[in-house]
Regions:
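Conserved acidic residues
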Residues: 3, 144, 194
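Feature captures the FAD/FMN-dependent oxidoreductase FAD-binding
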Residues: 70-155
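N-terminal Rossmann-like FAD-binding beta1-loop-alpha1 element of flavoenzymes
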Residues: 2-29, 198, 202-215
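A Rossmann-like FAD-binding core segment of flavoenzymes
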Residues: 109, 216-267
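Glycine-rich dinucleotide-binding loop and its adjacent helix/turn
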Residues: 148-218, 224
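Conserved Rossmann-like nucleotide-cofactor binding loop
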Residues: 12, 35, 153, 204, ...
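Glycine-rich active-site loop/strand segments that organize a redox cofactor
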Residues: 34-87, 181-185, 224-248
Length: 267
C-alpha cells in the first residue's frame, strides 16, 4: 500500500506521524529544512503562551515514554526552542520515524497521477504524486493521501494592502525582518538606538513590541512605532484576566498598557 505523505516536520506534522504510527498506517515525512521544528527555531527565544499540556500530542508522549523520556511539567510555559529540543528532536530519533524522515527535501508540486489541470472525473481515486528536490536532484514519490503541515511561517503577509507588497518593499527587503527578531539577544545591535516600525496586530507583533520596549529602557534613542491595518485590536489584546490562556491574556494586557502609556507611537 502507498504511504501517507506528511509534508512538514514541525509539531503538527510529527503529531500526525504519531497518530499514523498508532494506527499502523505507513507514512513518509518530507521536510524542507535540515532539521525538525525549523520554524519554531526561527523564534526559539520566544516563550509560548500555551503550557506544555497543550504543546505535546498524547500519541507522541505515549511513543516516547518507553525510551525513558521525561515529560515536562504540564503547567510550565516553554520557549519555542525547547519544544524542539525536548519533544520534536527526541521523537524524530525514534526508529519508526527516523527511517521515513526525509530532511532537506523541498516539495515543489503535488498533483494526482494521470490527471492534468483540466481533467477532474475520477481524480479523487488517483494516487497523489509529490515532486520534490533534494541535493539538487528532482524526484517524485507517490502517496495514498497527503497531510499538509507546512504552515505559513515562511510565507508571511506582506506590508502592503490587499495581500500585495507595499511599493518599494522588495527593494528594502534587507531592512525588513519578517517574524519575531531576537531583539534582546542575537539581533540587539540591529535595533538598539534605532527607530523601528512594527507592522501587524498579531501575537508576533506583540512579542516584538514588548521586547523593543524593554530594549528602549536599556538603549537610549530606541524608538517604537506600531502600525496596523484595522483599528480593532481585540484579537491581539486578548481577554486579559479572563483569557483562557493566562499568559496570552498577560501578553495582550502588557501591550495595551504600553500603548496607553505612550511608550510607542501608534498609527
Amino acid at each position: 500500500a502507498l504511504p501517507v505523505a506528511v509534508l512538514g516536520a514541525g509539531p503538527v506534522g510529527l503529531a500526525a506521524a504519531a497518530q499514523l504510527i498508532e494506527r499502523g498506517i505507513p507514512f513518509v515525512i518530507v521536510e524542507a529544512a535540515a532539521t525538525v521544528g525549523a520554524n519554531l527555531l526561527d523564534y526559539g527565544h520566544v516563550r509560548l503562551f500555551s503550557p506544555w499540556r497543550y504543546d505535546i500530542d498524547p500519541a507522541m508522549a505515549r511513543l516516547l515514554q518507553p525510551t525513558g523520556w521525561q515529560a515536562p511539567s504540564a503547567d510550565e510555559l516553554p520557549l519555542a526552542g525547547e519544544v524542539v529540543q525536548r519533544v520534536l528532536e527526541p521523537f524524530a530519533q525514534l526508529p519508526q520515524v527516523a527511517s521515513v524522515l526525509q530532511l532537506s527535501t523541498k516539495v515543489i508540486a503535488v498533483t494526482r497521477q494521470g490527471f492534468d489541470k483540466v481533467k477532474s472525473a475520477g481524480r479523487e481515486n488517483a494516487p497523489f504524486v509529490i515532486r520534490a528536490v533534494r541535493g539538487g536532484r528532482t524526484f517524485e514519490l507517490k502517496a495514498r493521501a497527503v497531510i499538509d503541515s507546512t504552515g505559513t511561517w515562511n510565507t508571511p503577509n506582506p506590508v502592503g494592502a490587499s495581500g500585495l507588497p507595499a511599493i518599494g518593499e522588495p527593494e528594502l527587503a534587507d531592512r525588513i525582518f519578517y517574524g519575531i527578531p531576537d531583539v534582546l539577544g542575537a539581533h540587539r545591535s540591529r535595533y538598539a538606538g534605532q527607530r523601528t516600525l512594527v507592522v501587524g496586530a498579531g501575537h508576533s507583533a506583540a512579542n516584538a513590541l514588548l521586547a523593543l520596549a524593554e530594549l528602549a529602557g536599556q538603549a537610549p534613542g530606541t524608538r517604537l512605532l506600531w502600525s496596523v491595518r484595522s483599528p480593532v485590536l481585540t484579537r491581539v489584546f486578548g481577554g486579559g484576566d479572563a483569557d483562557a490562556l493566562p499568559a496570552r491574556g498577560a501578553l495582550g494586557s502588557s501591550l495595551r498598557s504600553l500603548r496607553d502609556s505612550g511608550g510607542l507611537t501608534f498609527q
